[in-house]
From Swiss-Prot:
Membrane-topology descriptor: Single-pass membrane protein
Gene Ontology CC: one annotated term: membrane
Protein name: Uncharacterized protein TP_1032
Pfam families found in the cross-reference section: NusG_II (PF07009)
Species, as recorded: Treponema pallidum (strain Nichols)
Predominant cellular place of this UniProt entry's protein: membrane
Localization: Membrane
InterPro entries: NusG_2_sf, NusG_dom2
Segments crossing the lipid bilayer: 25-47
Keywords of the record: Membrane, Transmembrane, Transmembrane helix
Amino acid sequence: MACGENERASTSPPNRAAAARGGRLTLLDGCCVALVLALTAWSGFFVYRMQGGARTLDIRCGAQRWTYPLDQERVIRVRGPLGETEIEIRAGAARVCRSPCANGTCIAHPPVQRVGEWNACLPNGVFLYVHGTDAAEPEADAVQ
């Protein structure tokens, strides 16, 4: 094996653009790096800004609408066409405690606490929906 063969096999072809610049960054390289850093900071700002937002419970009955924070415990009574529906907010979640409906599906429903969750007493026309920004617990949008 000759020395020249070994040397040729271990070296890569010359990069003429890098050689012409002398291995230095150009103005365009600096702009690309600055753009990537700016986009990273911008996206991080929006991701962290949305975390830990206040969640509220939106209750609707007919044309009436009420909004309550989920971090304050209380019992709410809403009068619907069939009678009074009782809603309890406790430990950051809301549930229907009592309702005059015959089937009681709204009472059996688990408490709503995450943004986008809802419950309804259809016979009495009472709807509960959780609003806010809660990116702390992202979930896949799928049927479970």
